[in-house]
Amino acid sequence: MTDATTARLDDWAKKQTAAEELIPLVGRLYRENDVLLTLFGRSLLNKSVTGMIKAHRYARHFLGEELDIQITHRIVKALSGLNLAPARIDLGRLIEKLDDPNADVDAFLAAELAGVVESQSGKGETRDVVLYGFGRIGRLLARILIDRAGGTGMRLRAIVVRRNGDSDIVKRASLLRRDSVHGAFDGSIVVDEENNTIQANGTLIQVIYSNDPSEVDYTAYGINDAIIVDNTGKWRDEEGLSKHLACPGASKVLLTAPGKGDVKNIVFGVNDEAILDSDNIVSAASCTTNAITPVLKAINDKFGVRNGHVETVHSF
């Protein structure tokens, strides 16, 4: 082999080694401290070796060049020695502030992350989440919640659906395993038909059969103070969605469709400041609205928009 070929292979091997050492550090920080590490907005949790290297390649869109994974490894290793409170830390933005790669990383982190050390903020509590409905939106939400189940944030406890014939739970588990856009579920799914549960990786999901929101007692399943995510779209006004709040164990309702009447339609990053602590029912608007609004707002704020046309393509 030529010297250039050998050098490229050696460089790739070093990146692989750094990525292999990074992966358990990222996972441990999430499970033990509820610290989610990202790289310019992209989560590093549960990345493969190649995925971790690709994430550093992606950084060139922000830095003008690929981010050195060795620097990230030094930063994350130092983070592991800090007693951090729950936080979301963007390593890309953090490293941008590191003028000298050879600087004292411990001192740098102590200054930059002074607000998230454990002594200043206790570890957060988990919050029960129930998916009312298990269509495509519900299943994609389930994937996200399952993927992030190791921390102390949202914890998927149950799904509520109508029974649809024999082996209903088996069919629903099969749909969770496969998605036409996002592909196969990354992990293990085990169905317990006798107890009506689905275990997805380490998350035990109770399947509750009900025809109406007002029929469910969540406390009977050990679920309390839960956020009910209604992804059926059947009830969209305050009167209909309030049925969820009448159930023991439910405290908040999030609708994944456009709300009607006085229900606030919220797009995160655009108008989420409108949410008040006293709001018990909020709509996350539609898929289309969430897809177009952030981009449209940025364009409108910068250049102005006179009119537009939107087309949507649905998957299953």
Predicted regions and their residues:
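N-terminal Rossmann-like NAD(P) cofactor-binding subdomain of oxidoreductases
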Residues: 2-316
